[in-house]
């Protein structure tokens, strides 16, 4: 009975003794979520969701509100740290075969999509030049849907162009979606602890478990402290490091930026969208670039769960990481040679990973059987 008591959960939660630092990113993500929720609430108090006042209200927050510049910069920088942590978290899951816990993986993918939607709505709110044009380009993709496209776009905009109703509903969505993220995170954690965390070897952890506290809780605290230190270093020395310079100008529908792009953490998906010279094809590729993660648990063919003992799969995995970084880089560049060619090539390699890895798993099984 005492083992079930909530006060003793941190003491008695059994965890595999060999889980590495890659398992700390879940707690770092929760820290980012807490930071975002708190700073977001205080920013919402002073923000005005009106196209004539939004830009001025952000300036008012940074200049006139006590510690407003700290809240605004923490909110912006921790959004970037949030995505860095979540991409590492997903990469860890792919490398160590954690996707075989299907419920946890699929709830996590749903979380990622919700998070991306929330970040997109938030990017529009300052009503800067790049915010406005990125919103115009991305929402305009809905017109690629046959028959319903134009109606859906007009419905989303609240008119025939991005205007005051669009900003108001984007603010409402940006405010409400974090609560959906908190709920989904709770489901994600409950599902994870229902079966228990895996380990780098991909074996059953039941034979060797230790209490979560103090062994892993201190490790979590070290990584969280390191992340918050990095956050404050960026905040203190280069707060606009991850911002787009175009967003220091108020949105102007009559002037198009030379190169429209979203925030850096969406560039991989935007690069895939841009590499296809067809609107519907690009939109489908954009959606598939994230949705393809849901297929991974169902296409696993290897007898071994983790990639730790599969050198061929490891090579393919690191190719995927290099591809992801390259797509992000090319998407930040103008649409001109050689960036278009590089973007198209890396997009093909990105999708090829998800097709090749099951075939490679099957080939590795054959090699293992031959050796035996």
UniProtKB/Swiss-Prot annotation:
GO cellular component: mitochondrial inner membrane; respiratory chain complex III
TM spans (from-to): 25-45, 69-90, 105-125, 170-190, 218-238, 280-300, 312-332, 339-358
One MF term in the entry's GO annotations: ubiquinol-cytochrome-c reductase activity
Name the record gives this protein: Cytochrome b
Alphabetical UniProt keywords: Electron transport, Heme, Iron, Membrane, Metal-binding, Mitochondrion, Mitochondrion inner membrane, Respiratory chain, Transmembrane, Transmembrane helix, Transport, Ubiquinone
Record membrane topology: Multi-pass membrane protein
Chain positions recorded as heme b b566 binding sites: 89, 188
Places the protein is found: Mitochondrion inner membrane
Function: Component of the ubiquinol-cytochrome c reductase complex (complex III or cytochrome b-c1 complex) that is part of the mitochondrial respiratory chain. The b-c1 complex mediates electron transfer from ubiquinol to cytochrome c. Contributes to the generation of a proton gradient across the mitochondrial membrane that is then used for ATP synthesis.
GO biological-process terms attached to the record: mitochondrial electron transport, ubiquinol to cytochrome c
InterPro entries found in the cross-reference section: Cyt_b/b6_C, Cyt_b/b6_C_sf, Cyt_b/b6_N, Cytb/b6-like_sf, Cytochrome_b, Cytochrome_b_C_euk/bac, Cytochrome_b_N_euk/bac, Di-haem_cyt_TM
Cofactor note: Binds 2 heme b groups non-covalently.
Pfam families per record: Cytochrom_B_C, Cytochrome_B
UniProt family annotation: Belongs to the cytochrome b family.
Self-association and partners: The cytochrome bc1 complex contains 3 respiratory subunits (MT-CYB, CYC1 and UQCRFS1), 2 core proteins (UQCRC1 and UQCRC2) and probably 6 low-molecular weight proteins.
Organism per entry: Naja multifasciata
Keyword Transmembrane among record annotations: yes
Residues engaged in binding a ubiquinone: 193
